[in-house]
């Protein structure tokens, strides 16, 4: 039996863009033959793709770092470098992807074949053909490739099931699933026999079919982490109908109605509108002594909690072991599913806006100036750092171009206002230069 894993932490890094090239062709009467260096290729992106054949995040237990390839460098004759292939990472249906740093949901992957770009590959650097002007027909300038995006992610799998079985341990959830579907969950006469969710396809006599999940037993305090805690409550979130299984024989010495109230309290505490999902009460083990009397007492207590105009939850007496009452239960479940819409786990405010996620929604801060203990001025900022890493510091013309870009951004003036003097050291990353006033 394969291990089940429903959470994982991974890192993804898109490929860097290829560097642009400085090259010249040989042609009579053309300065230096004219520029002939091509652009670098685009870096590969990291893309998540849903594969309905996957049932767990187990693959991410052993492989936690995903890095796409970089684009090729530009070439002579103005030829562009080859762009790198995107890295496709397969995930199971029902995978929620969060940014580990912010906790924000990036995407919720539920459809087979659905794809989302998780980290964008860097743009290829421009070759010197791109920088030719009438004033400078033979530029010795080319850009380095742009770094690819890199981020830490949290993956969370919430299995896709139409119907979820909830209840205390050993109330018969696994037995019920095993007799109404082809699923083969582990069944035992002890608590927490089921320690992973089990999924089975159910087909009714009338031809309706739906997916049913047997979830590990809940106990009081599960929403605060008691027992198996919230690690399996998450799997209830995608269900449309809840079958609340209760041991009506009270074989564990608990009161069936108190079990019902306790489990509902846990669902409500966990939140995410779980109590908005329609419930069917499954009175199991009705073939056992005292079950009929317990059911009468249960119905009386339940009715006392509702107004006369409220609709009481449906109750179906069954015995999974004796295969009694199952047909009526399944037909009613299918009918309820047919008129119950899906529940959205995340509204638009929960999801990271795609434009904001990729840094285009609002104007980014161009630069920031701080001062180290050694009196060195330190420049930082997304735009400034991106320009820096794409500048070829081995060529004088590229350095001069970068200096003009800084001046155009107002860096020189800002340094003067902060008190920078001629000859002061300025640092960007690990690169240092002297401030010239």
From Swiss-Prot:
- EC numbers: 3.6.5.-
- Similarity section: Belongs to the TRAFAC class OBG-HflX-like GTPase superfamily. OBG GTPase family.
For this UniProt record, the keywords arranged alphabetically read as follows: Cytoplasm, GTP-binding, Hydrolase, Magnesium, Metal-binding, Nucleotide-binding
Sequence positions that bind GTP: 167-174, 192-196, 214-217, 284-287, 319-321
- Give the function comment from the record: An essential GTPase which binds GTP, GDP and possibly (p)ppGpp with moderate affinity, with high nucleotide exchange rates and a fairly low GTP hydrolysis rate. Plays a role in control of the cell cycle, stress response, ribosome biogenesis and in those bacteria that undergo differentiation, in morphogenesis control.
The residues covered by the OCT domain are 359-437
A cellular component term from Gene Ontology for this protein is:
cytoplasm
| Main localization (coarse) | cytoplasm
**Pfam families, A to Z:** DUF1967, GTP1_OBG, MMR_HSR1
The residue ranges of the OBG-type G domain are 161-338
Domain Obg stretches? 2-160
The places in or outside the cell where this protein is found are:
Cytoplasm
Protein name per Swiss-Prot or TrEMBL: GTPase Obg
Write down the top EC class of this protein.
hydrolase
Tell me yes or no: is Hydrolase among this UniProt entry's keywords. yes
Q: Where does Mg(2+) bind?
A: 174, 194
- Identify the cofactor(s): Mg(2+)
Question: What does the annotation say about its assembly with partners?
Answer: Monomer.
Q: Provide any one GO MF term from the record.
A: magnesium ion binding
Q: Name one GO biological process term.
A: ribosome biogenesis
PANTHER family from the xrefs? DEVELOPMENTALLY REGULATED GTP-BINDING PROTEIN-RELATED, MITOCHONDRIAL RIBOSOME-ASSOCIATED GTPASE 2
């Amino acid at each position: 039996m394969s291990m089940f894993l429903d959470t994982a932490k991974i890192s993804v890094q898109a490929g860097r863009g290829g560097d642009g090239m400085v090259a010249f062709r040989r042609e009579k009467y053309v300065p230096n033959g004219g520029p002939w260096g091509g652009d670098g290729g685009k870096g590969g992106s990291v893309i998540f793709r849903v594969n309905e054949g996957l049932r767990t995040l187990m693959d991410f237990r052993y492989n936690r770092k995903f890095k796409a390839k970089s684009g090729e460098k530009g070439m002579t004759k103005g030829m562009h470098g080859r762009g790198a292939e995107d890295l496709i990472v397969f995930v199971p249906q029902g995978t929620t992807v969060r940014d580990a740093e912010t906790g924000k949901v990036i995407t919720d992957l539920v459809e087979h074949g659905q794809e989302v770009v998780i980290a964008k590959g860097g743009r290829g650097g421009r070759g010197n053909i791109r920088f030719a002007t009438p004033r400078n027909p033979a530029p010795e300038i080319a850009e380095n490739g742009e770094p690819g995006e890199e981020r830490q992610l949290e993956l969370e799998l919430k299995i896709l099931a139409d119907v979820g079985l909830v209840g205390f341990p050993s109330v018969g959830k696994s037995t019920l699933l095993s007799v109404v579907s082809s699923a083969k969950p582990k069944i035992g006469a002890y608590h927490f026999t089921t320690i992973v969710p089990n999924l089975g396809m159910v087909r009714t006599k009338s031809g309706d079919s739906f997916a049913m999940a047997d979830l590990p037993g809940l106990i009081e305090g599960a929403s605060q982490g008691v027992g198996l805690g919230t690690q399996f409550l998450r799997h209830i979130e995608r269900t449309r109908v809840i079958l609340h299984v209760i041991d009506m024989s009270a074989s564990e010495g608990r009161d069936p109605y108190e079990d019902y109230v306790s489990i509902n309290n846990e669902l409500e505490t966990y939140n995410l509108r779980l109590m908005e999902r329609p419930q069917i009460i499954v009175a199991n083990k009705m073939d056992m002594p005292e079950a009929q009397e317990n059911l009468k007492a249960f119905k009386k207590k339940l009715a006392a909690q509702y107004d006369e105009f409220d609709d009481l939850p449906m109750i179906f007496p069954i015995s999974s072991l004796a295969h009694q009452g199952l047909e009526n239960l399944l037909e009613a479940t299918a009918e309820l599913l047919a008129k119950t819409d899906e529940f959205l786990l995340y509204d638009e405010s929960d999801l990271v806006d795609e434009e904001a996620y990729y840094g285009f929604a609002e104007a980014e801060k161009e630069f920031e100036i701080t001062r180290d203990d050694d009196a060195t001025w330190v420049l930082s900022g997304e735009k400034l750092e991106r320009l820096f890493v794409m500048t070829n510091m081995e060529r004088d013309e590229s350095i001069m171009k970068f200096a003009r870009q800084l001046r155009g951004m107002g860096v020189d003036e800002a340094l003067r206002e902060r008190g920078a003097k001629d000859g002061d050291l300025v640092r960007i990353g690990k690169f240092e230069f002297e401030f010239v006033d």
